[in-house]
Amino acid sequence: MKLTLMRDNGGTTTMRTLDINIQIETMKHETKAQPDSNLRTSIRYASPDSKLDDVKKLAKVVPAATFRKIVNGIQMTGYNGIIQIEVNHLANRMEVNRVKQEAAELSHTFAAFMGSGGHSVKIWIRFTRPDKSLPQKREEAEIFQANAYRKAVSLYPVSYTHLRAHETKA
């Protein structure tokens, strides 16, 4: 399975396709530049209305699909059925770890990890059709993604009071 990393480099969007397992391993170990740690420090000292430059330095992970640039924009080249839901506004690292552990114990969880801001957990769940296939066309993938997203929210405990489903566009 593959995913796409997108980064805005001063008005130009760059895209990179990676194996999903390699990306998960990469997220476990921060790079030398420490973009996540720098962002978490900035958040701690920022006022509510401030814009954080450290956010711009982070790549956007698009777990549901792979894309490529075309003349008129971007084109989906593959779809893997990954849905991301988020548990936001967690108080501290202990609460983040508790939610990660609870999510990891559920059989349908593909991956669960702390968000870059340090106060959320991202949970990835993989969905397929009953015959284990996935949509190939973008329009079909978008409908499938929307339905799978609603199902994903219902699979997780009500105790996640801050649960907000995050629909990743296919």
Which stretches of residues belong to each language-model region?
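DNA replication initiation on ssDNA origins
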Residues: M1-G81
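Short connector loops at helix/strand junctions that flank enzyme active sites
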Residues: G78-N80, S107, G118
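Histidine-centered divalent-metal-coordination microenvironment in nucleic-acid enzymes
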Residues: I85, F110-K137
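Short, surface-exposed ligand-recognition loops at beta-strand->loop->(often short) alpha-helix junctions
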Residues: E86-E95
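Helical (often loop-to-helix) elements that flank the catalytic cores of nucleotide-handling enzymes
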Residues: V99-E102, F127-Y160
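Conserved alpha/beta core surface patches that mediate binding of polyanionic ligands
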Residues: K100-F110
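Conserved small/polar residues in nucleotide/adenosyl-binding loops
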Residues: T161-A170
